[in-house]
Amino acid sequence: MASEITNGKNGQNGKNGQKEESDSQIAPPIPYPKSVAFIISNEFCERFNYYGMRTILVLYLTNKLGYNEETATVLFHTFTMLVYIFPLIGALIADGWLGKYKTILYLSLVYSLGAMVVSFGAVPLSGMPTKAVTVVGLLLIAIGTGGIKPCVSAFGGDQFSLPAQSFQLAKFFSLFYFAINAGSLISTTFTPILRADVHCFGDQDCFSLAFGVPAILMIFSVIIFMAGKRLYRCQPPAGNMIFGVSRCIADAFKGWQKRRHSEPMESFLDYAKPTVGSRMVQETKCLGRILRLFLPFPVFWALFDQQGSRWTFQATRMDGNVLGFQIKPDQMQVVNPLLILGFLPLFDYIIYPALARCGIRRPLQKLTLGLLLAALGFFLSAGLEMKMEQAAYRATPIEPDMTHLRIYNGMPCRYEISSAVVQTPRVIEPLNVWEDLSLQMTESKEYTFNAQPVSGECPSIIDKLRLQPGKSVSYFLAQDKLVEFADGLQMAATDTGRTSVRALLNTPDGEGPVLLSTESATSQEPPLTLDKGNVPQLHRITPGFARVDINGKKVASFEAKEGRLYSILVTGSARDGYQHNVIEVVALSTVSILWQLPQIVVMTAAEVMFSVTGLEFSYSQSPPSMKSVLQACWLLSVAIGNMLVVVIAEFKFTSSQSGEFTLFASLMLVDMMIFLWLARSYQYKDQREDFEDDDDATIDSVMQSKPKATTVDTTARKTNGIEAEPGYGAYRNHAYDNDFSEA
């Protein structure tokens, strides 16, 4: 029998012998469910696999599969969109057929298979359709991870007895999110190292290993999940509530058509009560009120998920050298989970209580702040991109009617050049370059070119310059001819943290081999053979110290910095000796990669305010029978957000990346105002309402028989002294009630 305690004023009123006491019973404390440990561990391993694979995916698409940045961005967000579409299917399977446990188990096996297929596809085997294998693997991963997403967090919530453990449930979601970001932190730290610092199959990187290690962790996650089977509280499937909701809406429409004049009702859905019952109608109304709030959410996810695509590509154009240590572009993604691990306790114990003192403690208020912070993060990224674009004009024309022209002098003589496109005759020093990056041109033209030696015994060169609007073209004076080649500077400068070198050799035929070798603090690459006749060829090297050897003799050496394109001009012969000059043609990576930190910090704070709060809000406010479905709808908003990125990337609404970032930030501000308008009248549902006795209707009756109608009290009431009011209701974060309770 439960012990009894006095509540209120205890003791006796001495002289009068009167005493006031009110007795109430309390149940013994419910122990924290041990099964949660297996769920948290499983989530850690699964997230390690997902984020490890996702971290390097865009670089794999560009570096190995040959896609450009735009196409890689579209593919990345299409994959992410599928990842968040399949939760709806997973929820249907869990709620209507297998239950959460079996759904998680079976789809995790599909997930593991997909991870292994992607890893196998990264092995450079002759004749293997790498792109097709990768697509199949990514599709299996999308089915697996998407299918289990709505089930795992809800399955964890099922382990708690509510409302008695509502406080522990709130802390579980923080712990659950902690596990997600711990797995993400470790995988985003080490997966780029496996990719870049390990050499395999004759390549300078090892994507197969970088994909393979996370795949092994995914297999471990399945084993861990199965190990806790005996401890799980497995709720039986509550019925396929998608069809239940659809039936409710369809019956309401039929009833409205027949009885709207003779029997007007307050709500459209009330017309379905005779067929599906009062409780089903009320839960459908509750679902509709929550989904109405979800409408603006996709824009947030459109911004958030670009950390893995656009922000990673932005990092490739930045200088990763920090105190002698080279930060890889994809490693910047590690900052987000690292900050999450610190931000969760910071927000729980400092920021949220501080906001509560200012009257900001409701979930919808926190969600609004999260939207605002996301907009701020993208305004910061737009500002950073503008700074980088100031140097980008050297790589490629920034206007469609602009042309870049460079003329390299590979001769040991000074040359005076003249042409109709050159306003006045110019002198080019030996082994140097003349350039004009602001030529205005509306159509393709040919111009006569004349190069006369000013000093030394060199021949005159007369040829043609062929220029096109919006293009960058270079010419090389060598021996007695003018060699034309396309620059390819933009691609070189954005090649994921590597450096590009072009060799312009004015040496006798037959002298060689000409070798380019590089050495960094962590590795030494095998020498590359330079082909004198292949002038346009760009050689990708790792930043470090580079040298050029001809016939085993060192000709040139220089420090190759990240994100640069160098032209090495060499003239002479083995008999007379060689002369050289190293020209840094493009230096896009002059902005430190650490300048990405402010936008990452702001976006991480937005994630904590929005995602953690939204996860708890969705679970606590959803009807008991629809929790997995509502979780799937939450994740479906992520899919729509990624589809928005695909649309904007494909239609190219702006001509610059900074303009695109500004567009997303502006959309976020408009989206936030829409959310404020939608949330202004939302009334929170107390979790304890889910556990009040309801003898008149059950969810089972929706599928099986016609229930009795019930009357639902929608007037304001008090719950534990907390009065419901518009936009607040009886819901509050109970963790702060002791300190900030209202009168």
UniProtKB/Swiss-Prot annotation:
Pfam families per the UniProt record, alphabetical: PTR2
Region listing for Disordered, in residue ranges: 1-28
Subcellular location: Membrane
Record field: compositional bias (Low complexity): 7-16
NCBIfam families linked: 2A1704
Record bears the keyword Protein transport: yes
Family, similarity comment: Belongs to the major facilitator superfamily. Proton-dependent oligopeptide transporter (POT/PTR) (TC 2.A.17) family.
Entry GO CC: apical plasma membrane; phagocytic vesicle membrane; plasma membrane
Originating species: Drosophila melanogaster
Main localization of the protein described in the UniProt heading: membrane
Known role: Important role in absorption of dietary peptides. High-affinity transporter of alanylalanine. Dipeptide transport activity is proton dependent.
Tissue localization of expression: Expressed in thorax and abdomen of females: apical epithelial membranes of midgut, rectum, and reproductive tract. Also expressed in neuropil of the central nervous system, with elevated expression within the alpha- and beta-lobes of the mushroom bodies.
GO MF annotations, alphabetized: dipeptide transmembrane transporter activity; oligopeptide transmembrane transporter activity; proton-dependent oligopeptide secondary active transmembrane transporter activity
Membrane spanning residue stretches: 74-94, 104-124, 132-152, 173-193, 207-227, 334-354, 364-384, 597-619, 629-649, 659-679
Name by which UniProt lists this protein: Peptide transporter family 1
One Gene Ontology term from the biological process aspect of the record: dipeptide import across plasma membrane
Key word Repeat present: no
pH dependence (record): Optimum pH is 6.
Gene that encodes the chain: yin
Membrane topology label: Multi-pass membrane protein
Keywords: Membrane, Peptide transport, Protein transport, Transmembrane, Transmembrane helix, Transport
